[in-house]
Amino acid sequence: MRTVIFKSCFKDDMQSFMEYRVATFARNTYRLDNYRLSSFDRYLTKISYNDEIVPQTIINQWLNEVGVPEASINGYIKTIRNFMKYRANMGKVVYLPPFQKTKDLYIPYIFSDEELSNIFAIADAYPMTNKFSSIPHTHMEMAVLIRLLYCCGLRLGEALNLKMEHLNLENGVIRIIHSNNKKQRLVPMHETLTNMLKDYCKVIKIYGIDNPFLFPGQSEHLSPITAERQFKKILRKAGIIKGNEDPHKRAPCLHCLRHCFMFHAFKQLETAGYHIDMASPYLSVYCGHESLVESEKYMKFSSELFEEDMLLFADFTESLFPEVDL
């Protein structure tokens, strides 16, 4: 993991804060904090900032210069708030920037059946990685990872954190330990996917190794950044992205496969005769959501494509959470 050398007037506090974070929090949380705080440090160094308290104007100027998308602003603010709380616990006077009210305008990209077929075919024919590479099995890892995300609706972090001990390949069940909500759950797999995982584990030779990651990376598991980079290569080859997209807008990504799973699972349950009020609780538990409100966020698709289904889900959630006169 890359070591950042902080240079601003808060360099010592930043260094000790990151040492605390790496010892206390998950690796991905640490990486995000490290990235955001180092950006903040560079900006403060650039403007020769040297005051004890950082006001809102300086924070806003930093966010504007970095070009943080609206949907990501509160993530950056959260890191700064945690850092300032850390300094406050050391007896220092700080300013805590408030979270900003943002509109969630993000609509996920829903891959068509033809696009999914192309993605799978391209992933299966992915060029073999150089055997001397630090990650020699990337070509096979991506083919399996993509199917796991789409077929089981896993979050990317959940899939990448899987180890052999979390898989029951005899019964076709995955045990999710590293969840967003810190809740464990069991995820059943289709027999076809289970057999693919068996073959994959044999080919990359992770059977018999002391508790290996399902998707080995350079040091631990395959990193989310590497996985997304490889997926974008596949999407470009499939003609789904062209390479000239706005860098500040979210393009199709691996997380879109979880949205695809949610929509197609909902459609299958509806086709099988399950009404929305029966199907939604099952999907909510299966996907590890804390509430049906969280599941509703995954039903944000283009209304032109799925207008009827959007109305069904909206009617259901309105009956669950009626308006209350205050």
Region locations from a protein language model:
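Conserved catalytic core of the tyrosine transesterase superfamily
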Residues: 1-326
